[in-house]
């Protein structure tokens, strides 16, 4: 159903007129099994479904004066044909042959293939009804079988197909295509002036231009369209680029179909909440496991608890603050969110929080504000935790319950630049090792400060402009869908190159971002109004922080001492 929102000229039926906003209805009886779309199979067999000046011209037949004898013979034949009643068996066979031949014609028809690239729910339901009716007819022919087992099987199958047909009939009443002839009268000079229209799914795309601000047009136009359609509809305003010309379009779709799409992908279910709780417990376990990697070799269980509790507290503070900020911002914009799913990792303990949008976004500002609320609050909380820990310890040496960061942890990973900037190198230019560095163990860092440092790195990973990560959502709001798709592909490619170069984190995060958070968000109802200069500036600032935090700096922040491997007191220089 994702294709329901993307307006591509190649996947929809283009309906144009040279003189006015004109629609042609295709509702001949022989094509009723295939929904709205049909093809005129007269002398213009399977012609392009396009309203144009050529279609509007009337092709008059050649008038020839028939002879009286020929006219009398034709009248006699017509009279005989009308008086001869067709047999029921022959009519059923002819209808079945006609239906099969018609389906074969549709399979070979190029215009039908284009239409099925953007099928409507109504057309799909009618196609299923046709197949169900055909199966019922086949079962009725086999109902006289003498085998009792086959008879029972046919009876059960017939009951099942009958229920299926009733269900499809009810669904057909719900999902009917909108009558674009009625809808076109709702557009005008005071809302959105439509100059062209084409069918898209069970709704349509009206091409034209806005005459007033979108905030004024949207409620007024939705009310008029819903009244004309006899049911609720949803309206989007977008920009469509064709032949290097940008046009404003208004897309109209039945609200029932949009609700069905969100219902099919909804995660606010019992299983969704169970999965969220399971991932939360798993993430707490990976945080506890990761904490043990940085203890002293002779650490006791009390030392472990003393180190793990601050790290847990730091992570929970970052996650809690960012989650509250995200929920409050989403509620302010009227957007429903799914349960939040933690991403466990045995490298950083947690790789962030994921959730989906379960309702339509009102505009690009909402698409921008919600991910920015999460990432900005996580950055600020992480920075405050690190600063508070360093201030309380009075130094950068970790205090009494320090975690010891091993040298291998600094090699070729995203923590390198920022952690080195905060705690300093293992040795300065003169070879003097930090006073509290432990030979063979690492540099001591306060657990609460380390939670803040990890929080900044994890937030930066989620700010990468890829798919439906927070950074991908921000890029889509700032630059549009096409540019965001290019950035997403480039980011996935760079992560793949990093993974092939030996970085397990790049490989794992690249696979996760591409396959689990790939794609793009549902378009906002207002895709025309930009986010504004202030939001654009904030997006650039967040992008710079992400870049500076994750930039692969193999030489370290202190270039002269970190070109060589880390070393400790007692090593030969």
Swiss-Prot record:
It comes from the Eukaryota. Belongs to the peptidase M50B family. Keywords: Chloroplast, Coiled coil, Hydrolase, Membrane, Metalloprotease, Plastid, Protease, Transit peptide, Transmembrane, Transmembrane helix. Probable membrane-associated metalloprotease that may be involved in chloroplast development. It is found in: Plastid, Chloroplast membrane. GO terms for cellular component: chloroplast membrane. Its main location: plastid. GO terms for biological process: proteolysis; response to salt stress. GO terms for molecular function: metallopeptidase activity. Its EC number is 3.4.24.-. It comes from Arabidopsis thaliana. This is Probable zinc metallopeptidase EGY3, chloroplastic. Residues 1-50 form a transit peptide.
